């Protein structure tokens, strides 16, 4: 790929349309100050081809649009694969403004569009035409020369890291990362499946399913047996039910026995009810005496507590009053502290002013000026104007240099115009002369042709005979001269060719003169306006300089020194000191407020304690009530000959007493009734035998049989469901085992690939292979561009150079001079470019310099090497700041920046 023509507009610093013709450039320098737009020209090429740049990538491309412009456009004409293409890319601040076109130049001179499909399709088509993707293109065509110098002098590990970065070996790391992620995923999948098999399907097997089936069949057999047993028990129960009437006597006898066994308990209950009736009148006296005692004890405790609380409240009030007096003693200090805080506020403001002004507390000056805000702003504005003036003068000098170069080229073109005008006159005169010679030769040829035609009839003339043409008698046969028509015809052809060459030369010269004259006329006006603008800018700069008096920067330092002195007088940290004063004021006021609040609380507690304390006479009333209740209780207990505890134990509620008495009466009546009924049944049944125990046993057996049958049927259903679930789990288990086996195979595959792609194995092997190929290519290239003096090789892990002009001496690259280092790094750069390009032929290289100022000998070596590169058919562009190097190159592209935007001027020679 070789660039032929670049047109850009609205692209970063290039606001206006800029045309750059690379067609006849072989070796050139791209020169300009920092920020002028040199890199933007390279970015424009990558943007045109790929829609992205090395600095921005594929995002944030609106930053490429010149400020104030709505769109940018870049058109790059280039040659690839023996054909000429043109890619045009437009980008706007709106999505609708974005467009890309690809055209191919046909042999008939017409452009054929190749822009069908989406923008993605067009981008892929462009990449196919160029033969390189974006990353490879930037590494192959735009070589970072400085990194190759670091590659030469780096340690082996550093060289491999840098080489991996230059060759894009990071993709191997991405592959390894992807493989590691796959290992992690398949390992997790395999472990999860194995865990499921071990936990949820541990007991799932064909044997377990067969065992459940056998258990279900046995349970079905048991259920059938229990069904037969239940029918037999039902028959027995029916026979026993026929004699159910005989059980009435046994039931009556049983009930009588139960009632007789309860007789002692009923008697004791009746006795307890009788005692409770005796003590019923004493129980209220017991309760009254207890309540009087409790009230007397509580009154005694409350009086003691109130007295203690009153003493405590009095002591607390005294302490609170003393604390308030102590806090109020600090209150007179507040005005003094507030005055100090106000003074520190002004010092804090001075510190803030000093910080905003860009000064420091340590600033000093031998002759400080008293601080004045207006004077400082005036001095700062003057200093800014002075800095702006310095920048403007620097830009103006650059503009003058660019104009000078442009005028030199203009003068050269003007001289060329004069020389070619004179040449045109000479070509015209030569053409007219050749035309006259052609006319003479053509006339001679015509005459010779006529002569030859007549001579062809001479053989038919005989003396005394009539002429075959005029029929007159021939008296004498004339003699004819032999003429070589072929020679004359050859002379005419040569003269015709000469006239045609003169005519074509004349037409070409006249077209060139016309085109150059148009350019001269246009540039004459343009350079005149340029010169006038420079003069006006010079006048403006002088006018601005005239209004700036003294030394504004020194005035700024003097004012800041005065302000810094004021800040230092206030202490190292006036803001902290002021905060300390304010905090102390707040602390004094807070202590006073807290003491007042504490005194108020203590006085409230004292008033409450005084109100709580009751007269001691109330304690005497409670004591009299207690003694009276105790005397009444003693008399009542003495009449019953009981103690208070015995009376309380014998006491029952009225409802319980009534219940016990009623229970005794009912028991006596029921026993009498049962005895009469039993005697009557004995008379009715006589001696007939009846066994109720057998009937109960049959009934129990039948109930148990029903329960067992139901349980057996439920168990059979559960076993059938369990068998079905086991069969389903067996199917799922087989599927999971298949998945686990597949996950294991995938894990083994990705684990092997991951181990192979690790940095310490595969990538180092790849880098070693790349390094070996690079050194081979770079060594051959270094041999060519150094006129057969140097070769580059690897010795014990270090780069060395073999000096063939010095008996093959081997030297470490660290001992090379600046020029020699440049040759070696240049060889590495171009070797890497060829390696990355593969089988794609690169017709252009752009190198950044990667070196500083060169001595004359090194400069000569570099210039010779670059000249050798040009002879290899490459277009080589050097992005450099070294003026001495750029002047040695055949052509220079001078990039300059002005208010109207950047522009490029080509200087040849």
Curated annotation (Swiss-Prot):
<dbReference type="GO" id="GO:1990391">
    <property type="term" value="C:DNA repair complex"/>
</dbReference>
<feature type="coiled-coil region">
    <location>
        <begin position="484"/>
        <end position="549"/>
    </location>
</feature>
<dbReference type="GO" id="GO:0006260">
    <property type="term" value="P:DNA replication"/>
</dbReference>
<dbReference type="InterPro" id="IPR027417">
    <property type="entry name" value="P-loop_NTPase"/>
</dbReference>
<keyword id="KW-0233">DNA recombination</keyword>
<feature type="coiled-coil region">
    <location>
        <begin position="285"/>
        <end position="453"/>
    </location>
</feature>
<dbReference type="GO" id="GO:0006310">
    <property type="term" value="P:DNA recombination"/>
</dbReference>
<dbReference type="GO" id="GO:0006281">
    <property type="term" value="P:DNA repair"/>
</dbReference>
<protein>
    <recommendedName>
        <fullName>Nuclease SbcCD subunit C</fullName>
    </recommendedName>
</protein>
<feature type="binding site">
    <location>
        <begin position="32"/>
        <end position="39"/>
    </location>
    <ligand>
        <name>ATP</name>
    </ligand>
</feature>
<keyword id="KW-0175">Coiled coil</keyword>
<dbReference type="Pfam" id="PF13558">
    <property type="entry name" value="SbcC_Walker_B"/>
</dbReference>
<dbReference type="GO" id="GO:0016887">
    <property type="term" value="F:ATP hydrolysis activity"/>
</dbReference>
<comment type="subunit">
    <text>Heterodimer of SbcC and SbcD.</text>
</comment>
<keyword id="KW-0378">Hydrolase</keyword>
<feature type="coiled-coil region">
    <location>
        <begin position="576"/>
        <end position="614"/>
    </location>
</feature>
<keyword id="KW-0540">Nuclease</keyword>
<keyword id="KW-0547">Nucleotide-binding</keyword>
<keyword id="KW-0255">Endonuclease</keyword>
<keyword id="KW-0235">DNA replication</keyword>
<keyword id="KW-0269">Exonuclease</keyword>
<feature type="coiled-coil region">
    <location>
        <begin position="652"/>
        <end position="751"/>
    </location>
</feature>
<dbReference type="InterPro" id="IPR038729">
    <property type="entry name" value="Rad50/SbcC_AAA"/>
</dbReference>
<comment type="similarity">
    <text>Belongs to the SMC family. SbcC subfamily.</text>
</comment>
<dbReference type="GO" id="GO:0004529">
    <property type="term" value="F:DNA exonuclease activity"/>
</dbReference>
<dbReference type="GO" id="GO:0004519">
    <property type="term" value="F:endonuclease activity"/>
</dbReference>
<dbReference type="GO" id="GO:0005524">
    <property type="term" value="F:ATP binding"/>
</dbReference>
<dbReference type="Pfam" id="PF13476">
    <property type="entry name" value="AAA_23"/>
</dbReference>
<dbReference type="GO" id="GO:0006302">
    <property type="term" value="P:double-strand break repair"/>
</dbReference>
<keyword id="KW-0067">ATP-binding</keyword>
<comment type="function">
    <text>SbcCD cleaves DNA hairpin structures. These structures can inhibit DNA replication and are intermediates in certain DNA recombination reactions. The complex acts as a 3'-&gt;5' double strand exonuclease that can open hairpins. It also has a 5' single-strand endonuclease activity.</text>
</comment>
<feature type="coiled-coil region">
    <location>
        <begin position="204"/>
        <end position="250"/>
    </location>
</feature>
């Amino acid at each position: 790929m070789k660039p032929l023509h670049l047109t850009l507009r609205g692209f970063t610093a290039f606001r206006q349309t800029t045309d750059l013709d690379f067609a006849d450039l072989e070796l050139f320098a791209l020169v300009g100050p920092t920020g002028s737009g040199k890199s933007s020209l390279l970015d424009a090429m990558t943007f045109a081809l790929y829609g992205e740049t090395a600095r921005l990538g594929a995002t944030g491309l609106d930053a490429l649009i010149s400020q104030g412009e709505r769109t940018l456009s870049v058109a790059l004409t280039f040659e690839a694969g023996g054909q000429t293409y043109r890619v045009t890319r437009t980008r706007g601040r709106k999505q609708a403004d974005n467009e890309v076109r690809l055209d191919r130049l046909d042999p008939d001179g017409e452009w054929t569009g190749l822009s069908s499909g989406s923008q993605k399709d067009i981008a892929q088509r462009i990449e196919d035409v160029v033969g390189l993707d974006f990353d490879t293109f930037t590494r192959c065509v735009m070589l970072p020369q400085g990194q190759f110098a670091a590659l030469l002098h780096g340690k082996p590990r550093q060289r491999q890291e840098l080489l991996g970065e230059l060759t894009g070996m990071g993709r191997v790391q991405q592959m390894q990362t992807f493989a590691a992620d796959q290992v992690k995923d398949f390992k997790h999948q395999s472990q999860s499946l194995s865990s499921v098999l071990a936990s949820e399907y541990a007991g799932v097997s064909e044997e377990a399913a067969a065992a459940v089936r056998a258990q279900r069949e046995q349970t079905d057999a048991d259920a059938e047996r229990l069904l037969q047993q239940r029918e037999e028990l039902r028959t027995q129960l029916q026979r026993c039910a026929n004699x159910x009437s005989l059980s009435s006597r046994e039931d009556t006898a049983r009930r009588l026995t139960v009632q007789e066994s309860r007789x002692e308990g009923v008697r004791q209950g009746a006795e307890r009810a009788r005692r409770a009736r005796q003590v019923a009148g004493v129980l209220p006296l017991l309760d009254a005496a207890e309540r009087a005692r409790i009230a007397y004890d509580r009154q005694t405790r409350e009086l003691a507590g109130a007295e203690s609380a009153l003493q405590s409240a009095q002591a607390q009030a005294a302490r609170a009053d003393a604390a308030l007096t102590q806090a109020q003693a600090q209150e007179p200090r507040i005005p003094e502290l507030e005055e100090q805080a106000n003074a520190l506020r002004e010092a804090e403001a001075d510190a803030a002013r000093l910080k905003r002004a860009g000064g420091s507390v340590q600033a000093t000056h031998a002759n400080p000026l008293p601080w004045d805000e207006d004077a400082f702003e005036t001095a700062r504005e003057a200093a800014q104007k002075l800095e702006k003036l310095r920048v403007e003068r620097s830009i103006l000098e650059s503009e003058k240099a660019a104009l000078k170069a442009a005028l030199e080229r203009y003068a050269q073109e003007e001289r060329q115009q004069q020389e070619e005008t004179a040449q045109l006159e000479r070509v015209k005169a030569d053409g007219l002369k050749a035309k006259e010679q052609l006319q003479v030769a053509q006339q001679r040829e015509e005459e010779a042709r006529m002569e030859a035609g007549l001579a062809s009839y001479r053989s038919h003339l005989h003396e005394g005979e009539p002429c075959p043409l005029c029929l007159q008698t021939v008296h004498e046969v004339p003699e004819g001269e032999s003429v070589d028509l072929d020679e004359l015809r050859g002379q005419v052809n040569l003269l015709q060719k000469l006239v045609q060459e003169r005519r074509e030369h004349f037409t070409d010269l006249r077209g060139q003169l016309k085109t150059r004259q148009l350019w001269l006329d246009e540039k004459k006006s343009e350079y005149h306006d340029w010169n006038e603008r420079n003069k006006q800018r010079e006048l403006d700069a002088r006018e601005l300089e005239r209004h700036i008096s003294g030394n504004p920067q020194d005035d700024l330092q003097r004012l800041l020194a005065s302000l810094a002195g004021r800040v230092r007088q206030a202490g190292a940290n006036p803001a902290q000191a002021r905060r300390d004063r304010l905090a102390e004021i707040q602390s004094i006021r807070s202590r006073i407020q807290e003491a007042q609040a504490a005194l108020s609380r203590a006085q409230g507690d004292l008033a409450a304690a005084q109100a709580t304390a009751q007269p001691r006479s109330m304690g005497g009333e409670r004591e009299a009530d207690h003694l009276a209740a105790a005397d009444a209780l003693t008399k009542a207990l003495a009449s019953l000959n009981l103690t208070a505890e015995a009376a309380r134990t014998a006491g029952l509620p009225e409802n319980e007493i009534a219940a016990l008495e009623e229970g005794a009466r009912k028991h006596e009546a029921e026993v009498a009734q049962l005895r009469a009924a039993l005697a009557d049944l004995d008379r009715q049944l006589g001696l007939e035998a009846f066994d109720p125990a057998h009937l109960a046993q049959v009934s129990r057996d039948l109930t148990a049989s029903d329960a067992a049958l139901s349980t057996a049927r439920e168990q059979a259903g559960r076993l059938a469901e369990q068998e079905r679930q086991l069969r389903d789990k067996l199917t799922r288990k087989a599927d999971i085992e298949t998945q686990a086996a597949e996950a294991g195979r995938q894990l083994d595959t990705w684990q092997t690939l991951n181990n192979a792609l690790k940095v310490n194995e595969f990538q180092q092997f790849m880098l070693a292979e790349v390094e070996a190929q690079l050194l081979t290519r770079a060594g051959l290239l270094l041999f060519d561009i150094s006129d057969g003096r140097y070769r580059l090789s690897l010795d014990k892990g270090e780069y060395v150079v073999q000096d063939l002009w010095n008996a093959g001496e081997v030297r470490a690259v660290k001992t090379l001079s600046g020029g020699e280092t440049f040759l070696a790094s240049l060889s590495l750069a171009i070797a890497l470019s060829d390696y990355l390009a593969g089988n794609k032929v690169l017709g252009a290289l752009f190198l950044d310099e990667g070196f500083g100022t060169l001595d004359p000998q090194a400069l000569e070596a570099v210039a010779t090497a670059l000249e050798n590169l040009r002879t290899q058919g490459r277009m080589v562009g050097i992005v450099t700041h070294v003026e001495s190097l750029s002047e040695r190159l055949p052509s220079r592209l001078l990039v300059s920046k002005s208010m109207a935007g950047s522009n490029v001027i080509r200087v040849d020679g």
